[in-house]
From Swiss-Prot:
Name used for this protein in its record: Keratin-associated protein 10-9
Taxonomic lineage of the native organism: Eukaryota, Metazoa, Chordata, Craniata, Vertebrata
Record organism: Homo sapiens
Tissue expression from the record: Restricted to a narrow region of the hair fiber cuticle, lying approximately 20 cell layers above the apex of the dermal papilla of the hair root; not detected in any other tissues.
Claim: Protease is one of the keywords in the record: no
Record's subunit section: Interacts with hair keratins.
Annotated region (25 X 5 AA repeats of C-C-X(3)), positions in chain: 26-254
UniProt KW keywords: Keratin, Repeat
Length: 292
């Protein structure tokens, strides 16, 4: 129906056609029930709730019209009740933003079972993309529940069990629907990104820490052995355990001003043997060569 209607106003002084400024009617069938519409002083039918407490007009969506204020202020729309909220529930529902308070339009998945507790990261039916695909706005849906399960390791950082194999993908944090500002990086360390070789279980010249693992070279910051040989199918360490001994512990100088006389291992040998069969040392007291 048009926003304004033509009406004839009889007058002893004028019988001309005039256009009045009556607002758009909401009494069309798709809008309000007929029982909630009442004739206005002008010839345009304006949707006016019969009762401001309970009226059929408040149960049906009203297009922008004067009756909208009566709907929103006098009753709770039915779209705000508990239901199996679909992701596009609010956008596809007959309720308009003015008629349906955004707090009522929060889908079920936007309200996590817990709030910030450790149990929030446990296995649940909560989908990772719930907040992203939800019709709730970010201010309406607190993304605490958006933290993936793998973002919370089951062990302490210095624990050896933390380095065991897990199902956590390396791109867990980056592929999470949570934004960087919502997901604390400390909690987003994938368990699988800290392989066994990153926590050596050996000391000194032991080669146990040099075993093969899924650890990327950039993952290990400290290791007692050098990277494995790229030409060996058995993937043995490039160096033997003797090469793994730090130079400082090979020959301890008697004076802090004198350098260590341990020679570097051969860089052309795949077995990485020392240049001499045993690291050469000099006795600072006698000045004679000896063996370590």
């Amino acid at each position: 129906m048009a926003a304004s209607t033509m009406s004839i106003r009889s007058s002893a002084y004028s019988d001309s056609w005039q256009v009045d400024d009556c607002p758009e009617s909401c009494c069309e069938p798709p809008c309000c029930a007929t029982s909630c519409c009442a004739p206005a002083p002008c010839l345009t039918l304006v949707c006016t709730p019969v009762s401001r407490v309970s009226s059929p007009c408040c149960q049906v969506t009203c297009e922008p019209s004067p009756c909208q204020s009566g709907c929103t202020s006098s009753c709770t729309p039915s779209c705000c009740q508990q239901s199996s909220c679909q992701p596009a529930y609010c956008t596809s529902s007959p309720c308009q933003q003015a008629c349906c308070v955004p707090v009522c339009c929060k889908p079920v998945c936007c309200v996590p079972v817990c709030c910030g507790a450790s149990s929030c990261c446990q296995q649940s039916s909560y989908q990772p993309a719930c907040c992203a695909s939800s019709s709730c706005q970010p201010a309406c849906c607190v993304p605490v529940c958006c933290k993936p399960v793998c973002c919370a390791p089951t062990c302490s950082e210095d624990s050896y069990s933390c380095c065991q194999q897990s199902s956590c993908q390396p791109a867990c944090c980056t592929s999470s629907p949570c934004q960087q500002s919502y997901c604390v990086p400390v909690c987003c360390k994938p368990v699988c990104c800290k392989p066994i070789c990153c926590v050596p279980v050996c000391s000194g010249a032991s080669s146990l820490c040099c075993q093969q693992s899924g650890c990327q070279p950039a993952c290990c910051t400290t290791s007692c052995c050098r990277p494995s040989s790229s030409v060996s199918l058995l993937c043995r360490p490039v160096c033997r355990p003797a090469c793994c001994v730090p130079v400082s512990s090979c020959c301890a100088p008697t004076s802090s001003r004198q350098p260590s006389y341990c020679r570097q291992a051969s860089c052309v040998s795949l077995l990485c043997r020392p240049v001499c069969s045993r690291p050469a040392c000099y006795s600072f007291s006698s000045g004679q060569k000896s063996s370590c």
